């Protein structure tokens, strides 16, 4: 197995960035990928777009998209006792939240640790034990005596709250634990792809859009697509692994990238899908298909941009999405990098334009 640059993944996973607060992540992307591209720029929603130009004039544009934001919270109220009432930003399930360590990031960039409050089970009636606490009812215990103490720390209403999770290799080091793999693992894929292509002569212009605000309505993808005006687009995102005792389904970790046929918001272009399958077979890369009936990816708003964009999604399976700790597999990460790199090396300008429906 090829070596994984764990430092990139560690920095991406441990960085804090909910929708609208993605600057920490965009700085990491720029740090690791700017040297491999011709230029980069930000759009007005904060998406970072990195561009590798073909030497051929009027080359078709291929857009890679991966979102930087993670699910988290903002502080909605500070009680007189110094507790922080939270408002979820993105989708949370109440069962995974009690007693989790979280980190508050102030507007000045200072970071403080707290714990999501939970009731002790002693004497709790059965109906309360079985209740899922709504995510907007949770509070953060900062270990302070008063609201005045909170103010002295510089914490204010509106500050970002994210899981405090340390990235690490697990007992089998092919398994990687961290927060925010949705979608930082795919941001890492795109960084590695741009670096792999740095010295390659391509028939297409490649635009990597590290997008914003996906978890709150797939908002950043559309303005990024309008900025780029791509001929085709590939969204990179995670999908749910179903290989645990709770699920026992088909998508397992470590079996290669996942090609999305459709999800609830996008029907992937069938010719683009077939080309991706062809590249995978040629490179002897395992792959699976996905039909995600709930949720969507950046492809949702990219394919509806302008007069329409040929698009599909390539995914990496992930355990425990939208929680404080997620698990991925190195093999899926590496094989997705290879698949995308080879696709971009092999795709011709004629093929790129032939994918358009009706031509």
Predicted regions span which residues?
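N-terminal hydrophobic/helix-forming segments and targeting peptides
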Residues: 1-359
């Amino acid at each position: 197995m090829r070596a994984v640059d764990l430092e990139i993944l560690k920095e991406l996973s441990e960085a804090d960035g909910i929708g609208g607060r993605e600057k920490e992540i965009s700085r990491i992307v720029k740090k690791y990928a700017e040297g491999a591209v011709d230029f980069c720029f930000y759009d007005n929603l904060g998406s970072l777009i990195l561009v590798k130009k073909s030497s051929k004039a009027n080359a078709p544009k291929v857009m890679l998209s991966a979102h930087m934001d993670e699910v988290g919270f903002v502080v909605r109220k500070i009680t007189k006792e110094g507790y922080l009432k939270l408002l979820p930003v993105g989708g949370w399930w109440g069962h995974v939240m009690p007693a989790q360590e979280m980190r508050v990031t102030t507007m000045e960039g200072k970071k403080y640790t707290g714990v999501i409050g939970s009731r002790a089970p002693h004497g709790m009636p059965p109906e309360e034990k079985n209740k899922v606490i709504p995510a907007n009812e949770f509070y953060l215990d900062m270990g302070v005596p008063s609201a005045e103490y909170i103010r002295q720390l510089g914490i204010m209403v509106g500050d970002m709250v994210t899981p405090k999770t340390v990235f690490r290799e697990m007992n089998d080091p092919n398994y990687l634990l961290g927060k925010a793999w949705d979608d930082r693992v795919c941001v890492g894929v795109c960084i590695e792809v741009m670096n792999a292509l740095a010295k390659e002569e391509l028939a297409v212009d490649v635009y990597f859009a590290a997008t914003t605000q996906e978890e709150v309505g797939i908002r950043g993808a559309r303005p990024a697509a309008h900025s780029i005006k791509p001929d085709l687009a590939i969204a990179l995102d995670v999908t749910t692994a179903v290989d645990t005792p709770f699920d026992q389904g088909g998508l397992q970790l470590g079996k290669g990238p996942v090609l999305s046929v459709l999800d609830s918001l996008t029907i992937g272009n069938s010719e683009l899908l077939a080309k991706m399958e062809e590249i995978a077979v040629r490179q002897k890369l395992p792959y699976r298909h996905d039909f995600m009936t709930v949720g969507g990816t950046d492809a949702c708003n990219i394919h509806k941009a302008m007069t329409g964009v040929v698009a599909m999604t390539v995914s990496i399976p992930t355990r425990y999405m939208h929680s404080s700790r997620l698990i991925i597999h190195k093999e899926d990460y590496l094989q997705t990098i290879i698949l995308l790199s080879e696709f971009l090396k092999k795709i011709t300008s004629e093929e790129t334009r032939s994918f358009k429906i009706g031509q």
